[in-house]
Structure formats: C-alpha cells, structure tokens
Amino acid sequence: MLSFSDILLKLQEFWKNQGCLIVQPYDIPAGAGTFHPATLLRSLDSKPWNVAYVAPSRRPTDGRYGENPNRLGSYYQFQVLIKPSPDNIQELYLRSLEALGLDLKSHDVRFVEDNWESPTLGAWGLGWEVWLDGMEVTQFTYFQQVGGIPCRPVAVEITYGVERLAMYIQSVENIFDILWNDSSNSAPMLYADVHLQSEYEFSKYHFELADTQMIFSLFNQYTQEVKHCLQQKVPLVAYDYTMLASHFFNILDARKAISVAQRQNYILQIRELAKGCATLYKEMEEERTMRREKNKGL
C-alpha cells in the first residue's frame, strides 16, 4: 500500500519522466497550487514551460478544528503545468494514475465538465473535474486567461487532490487515518500525527483569535508595497506581496471581519494587484525575448 509520501514521490517521478521540471513548494501561504509563481506567472511566458511540484495549500475558512474527516484548512495539492498543452495530456494523466498502482479497467474514471475561475487572480480556464468511482480527485484546466491576460499558447494545469487520492488508495474514510510514511524502516505515522494539532490550532486562530485590526493594517501595507514594487519594475517581488495580501484577506474572511459587500471590494483589490503583476511580468518577459532574438542576429 502506498503511503502519502510515496504518492507524492511517485507523482514527481512520473512527471519528471515526462519532461517536467520539478520545483519546490513556494514559501508564502496560498490557497491553491495555481498561486505559485511557477504556474501563475510562468503560464504567461511565450516559450514552453513544463513544471510539477507539491503545493501545500491553506484555506482558513475550510478549517474545522480537526473534527471533520473530509475537510481541512491546510492540505496538499500536486500541481502540473505544461505549456503548450500536449495533445495526449489525458492519456498522460491516466498513466499517472496507473503509476500509483490503480487498475483503471477496474474503476470508473470520468471527466466531468467543470470550467474554472479564480476571481482574485483574474484567471479562468476550460476543463474538467476527474472523478474516480464518483469522487473528485483532480481538476484539469486549460488556461485561457491569467491576470487578465490571454494565455498564448494555452497551458494545461493538472491539480491532484493528494489527500483524496490517498484516502482512496489506502481505503480509509478519515483524512487523519491516512498512513503518512513507509513504515518498513520506521514507526508508522498517520496524517493525524503530522497535522491534527496544527489543524486545531490554526482553526482556533482563524475563527477566534486573529487580531483583525492588525491584519487589516497588514493587508493595507502589503497592497501599498505591491504598488511600490510595480513602480520599481520588480514584478516577482510585487507578486509575493500580492500573495501575502490574499492570504491575510482569507484570514479576515474566516474571522468574519468583512461584510458581504466589502468582500467583493477586497477581491477586486487583489485582482487588480495580480493583474498589475502579470502585466508587468509579461511586458518584461517580452522585452527579454526581443533582446535575445536581437542578440542572436548580431
């Protein structure tokens, strides 16, 4: 039986063998793997870009103090981005499931139309949910637009729900019962041993303890720093602060410190910041490309 760690390693190995660059998780909290600059910004590059990575994800509003067997405030995704999208991407994805030991002839695998949108990132795409015997385990998206900019050529994003895959592969009903490690050479560790206490503490913080006055102040400071960095033409730095602003907005949302009307205004603020980062990144990437082409002709 594959452990949680084994699943991540096998996915990395599979996609490495398909030509993907394996990069590391980003060091700023994010609600999904899409926020990683290796996806969000690199999907705008004019040249090919194939990448895969583990994406620790935080969604404060989804926390349940570690008491819900299927819902977490912090969890893992495995993210793949390939630009341009290959014609055989569905076949490659199915082969990745087989690499995890799944006999697809014995299971019902369905691609269910489910187009994707991220209001805070100004991004959307066409795609599907992938259901394995009735449970969603993956999201497929063909990016059409990121940061308000059309993706040319179109990139395909594959986002695996690692906990759901692990529950299925290990035949457990509770996330916290997932076997984390290969116990042949060490004591067995469960998902609960690694994450249950932090799930409780961060739920308590996000719902009860977070100092909203301080977080509002930090949000405003981060948004100002994004604008400063864009003026100084450092879009990668500006995007870091955009991610931080987004994370602190999510904490305020979990703390119920933002009204329904205010919530939309905050989302629009973050979207404009993300668009600014994407626009400047794309402009500078095109300038670098033109310089390279010019130098080749010398």
Swiss-Prot record:
It is an enzyme of class 6 (ligase). Keywords: Aminoacyl-tRNA synthetase, ATP-binding, Cytoplasm, Ligase, Nucleotide-binding, Protein biosynthesis. Its main location: cytoplasm. GO terms for cellular component: cytosol. InterPro entries: aa-tRNA-synth_II/BPL/LPL, Gly-tRNA-synth_heterodimer, Gly-tRNA_ligase_asu. It comes from the Bacteria. It is found in: Cytoplasm. Its EC number is 6.1.1.14. It catalyses: tRNA(Gly) + glycine + ATP = glycyl-tRNA(Gly) + AMP + diphosphate. GO terms for biological process: glycyl-tRNA aminoacylation. SUPFAM superfamilies: Class II aaRS and biotin synthetases (SSF55681). GO terms for molecular function: ATP binding; glycine-tRNA ligase activity. Tetramer of two alpha and two beta subunits. Belongs to the class-II aminoacyl-tRNA synthetase family. This is Glycine--tRNA ligase alpha subunit. It comes from Helicobacter hepaticus (strain ATCC 51449 / 3B1).
